[in-house]
Amino acid sequence: MRTVIIGNRKLARHLLRHTLAEGWNVVGAVVPDGKLASRQANFVPVSELVADTGCRLHETDDINSTETFEWFQKLNIDLCLCGGWSQIIEPRILDVPKRGFLGFHSSRLPEGRGGAPVNWSLIDGADE
């Protein structure tokens, strides 16, 4: 299954490492470009890990751009896994992978969106 990983947090690195270790066919990764990365807290560089895999790398400051959409289409993706991105991903991007698009987040959405979702969930008294 042709898979793409999206993200810029520790979770994205874990997704990439785990899928590759399990023998998945990871064909690409989307990471923030330098401009976007410099504005994000908890940024973890995923691109250096991607460089060691031979996967295609796409750097962008807008996950919903026409350029990113066309990049997704060219890769003929079956599945996309997203772990840590700062934008809401538009339906036209979500609809590209044939088998689906899975997003991973460490709190309930939309209530827990934003930075430090686990911390804020605890501060707010969430029990799940």
Which residues are covered by each model-predicted region?
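One-carbon transfer enzymes
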Residues: 1-128
